[in-house]
C-alpha cells in the first residue's frame, strides 16, 4: 500500500517520466498504474489488420495508456505504427527498437540501432525498451532455468554477445550514453 508520507525522489528508481505528445507523464511508485497494449507487424500482409486494431483501441471507452509497437518489419516511418500512435492517437507510443535492426550473421550494428532509437525519440516515442543488463554472467545463470530466455529482444542482445564471444560490452551499453543524451 502506498504511504503518502514517504518522500518520492524522482530519478532515484522511484519515478520516471514518459513523453506523451507535448506533455510529460510521471510513472512509478505512488503513481497510477498504466495499461500497455501491444501491436506489431511481423508480416507485411498484416498491416491493415494492425491498423484496424489501433482504430478499435481508439474507440474503447476505457482504453490503454500506452501502445507498444513490437513490429519486426521496418516500413516507411510515416506508415509505422509507433509514428501513427504519436500523431493520430492520445496514447503514449512505445517501441522495441532492436526488433527493427537488420543483423548480419546475427550481429547487431550499434550505429543502426542508435539511428533507429534517435529517429523514434525525435518523432515523439515516449518509451523505448532496451536490454542493457544482458551479459555473460546472466547468460550462465539463465542456462539453469527451464526456459533460459523469456525476452525476444534480450535474446537478440545475447546472441550478439555470444557471437562476439562476450568480448566488449552489450550492444545497448555501447550506445547508452548517446541514448541518455537524446532522452
Label each region the model flagged.
Residues 1-183:
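Alpha/beta enzyme core
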